[in-house]
Amino acid sequence: MRIGLFAVGRLKSGPEKDLAARYFDRFAKAGPAVGLELTRVAEVAESRASNAETRKREEAAMLLKSLADGSILILLDERGKALDSEAFANLLGSYRDQGKRELTIAIGGADGLDPSLYDRADATLCLGKMTWPHQLVRTLIAEQLYRAVTILSGHPYHRV
């Protein structure tokens, strides 16, 4: 199953970008053994519209336009469902085992996500109830993707 990340906003050079890249690289190397492939990390510029609702609508349109037909869409939102790492790995494994070919994980902009995305989403997850900066969210999801691969492959990286 091909997995992509869609993020509103660009990750600037620095330790967050380096760490995210390290985990995406680990995922890209280990994922194919369990049927998961990193296809892309797409960054789009934040909308310059004058109000939040228009910005969210424009950013949602960019995301929806980039989705492949039939792609699973997982939104990251502080109001989403909290999963532990094993449950997240099992969710990815379940989509893979159902024969799903594409999965996109979306990180919204500073204003959040447009309501239309919740209607389209297959799942809405959170990385905890706290609000995280977008730079850290990207790093956290990169690490969790790598951790999911290690869980699915029985690698000892994930210890309970």
UniProtKB/Swiss-Prot annotation:
> What reactions does this protein catalyze?
pseudouridine(1915) in 23S rRNA + S-adenosyl-L-methionine = N(3)-methylpseudouridine(1915) in 23S rRNA + S-adenosyl-L-homocysteine + H(+)
For this chain, one GO molecular function annotation is:
rRNA (pseudouridine-N3-)-methyltransferase activity
State the compartments where it is located.
Cytoplasm
Q: Which amino acid positions bind S-adenosyl-L-methionine, per UniProt? A: 76, 108, 127-132
The record's keywords, sorted A to Z, are:
Cytoplasm, Methyltransferase, rRNA processing, S-adenosyl-L-methionine, Transferase
Recorded hits in InterPro entries, A to Z, give:
Alpha/beta_knot_MTases (IPR029028), RlmH-like (IPR003742), tRNA_m1G_MTases_N (IPR029026)
Q: Does the keyword Cytoplasm apply?
A: yes
Cellular component per GO? Answer: cytoplasm
Q: What Enzyme Commission number(s) apply to this enzyme? A: 2.1.1.177
User: Its principal location?
Assistant: cytoplasm
| Family, as annotated | Belongs to the RNA methyltransferase RlmH family.
Q: What is known about its subunit structure? A: Homodimer.
Tell me, in a sentence or two, what this protein's role is: Specifically methylates the pseudouridine at position 1915 (m3Psi1915) in 23S rRNA.
Instruction: Please report the name of this protein according to its UniProt entry.
Output: Ribosomal RNA large subunit methyltransferase H
Which organism is the protein's source? Rhizobium johnstonii (strain DSM 114642 / LMG 32736 / 3841) (Rhizobium leguminosarum bv. viciae)
High-level lineage: Bacteria, Pseudomonadati, Pseudomonadota, Alphaproteobacteria, Hyphomicrobiales
